């Protein structure tokens, strides 16, 4: 997926679990544009993961074996925490 195709990335952010939408959609909306190109590619790679894995990782019930994916999970968690709650 092209890092500049925001419509397609936005669609990929929409998950089957409300809990994931609450974490991923605000991060995309408020933070994606400020990411480096490498981190944008990493975020897109994270979106290819299965919903149950994403849910567990974002809820701190385990972590991905891939350290770069883990770094992106932590970035999402930290930026969402710093920003505070927003409407989805």
Swiss-Prot record:
The gene is sdhE. Belongs to the SdhE FAD assembly factor family. It is found in: Cytoplasm. An FAD assembly protein, which accelerates covalent attachment of the cofactor into other proteins. Plays an essential role in the assembly of succinate dehydrogenase (SDH, respiratory complex II), an enzyme complex that is a component of both the tricarboxylic acid cycle and the electron transport chain, and which couples the oxidation of succinate to fumarate with the reduction of ubiquinone (coenzyme Q) to ubiquinol. Required for flavinylation (covalent attachment of FAD) of the flavoprotein subunit SdhA of SDH and other flavinylated proteins as well. Its main location: cytoplasm. Monomer. GO terms for cellular component: cytoplasm. Pfam families: Sdh5 (PF03937). It comes from the Bacteria. GO terms for biological process: succinate metabolic process. Keywords: Chaperone, Cytoplasm. InterPro entries: SDH, SDH_sf, SdhE_FAD_assembly_factor. This is FAD assembly factor SdhE.
């Amino acid at each position: 997926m092209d890092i500049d195709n925001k419509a397609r990335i936005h669609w990929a952010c929409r998950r089957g679990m409300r809990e994931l939408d609450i974490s991923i959609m605000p991060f995309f909306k408020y933070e994606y544009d400020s990411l480096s190109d490498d981190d944008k590619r990493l975020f897109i790679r994270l979106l290819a993961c299965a919903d149950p894995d994403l849910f567990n990782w974002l809820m701190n019930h385990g972590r991905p074996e891939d350290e770069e994916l883990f770094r992106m999970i932590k970035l999402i968690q930290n930026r969402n925490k710093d920003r505070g709650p927003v409407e989805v």
